[in-house]
Swiss-Prot record:
Family: Belongs to the FARP (FMRF amide related peptide) family.
Residues recorded as bearing Leucine amide in the entry: 9
Keyword Secreted: yes
GO biological process, one term: neuropeptide signaling pathway
Record function comment: FMRFamides and FMRFamide-like peptides are neuropeptides.
UniProt main location, coarse: secreted
Keywords carried by this UniProt record: Amidation, Neuropeptide, Secreted
Keyword Protein transport assigned: no
Identification of the protein by name: Extended FMRFamide-3
């Protein structure tokens, strides 16, 4: 979803 990049910390 839109938070995918953030979750890939």
């Amino acid at each position: 979803g839109p938070d995918s990049a953030f979750l890939r910390l």
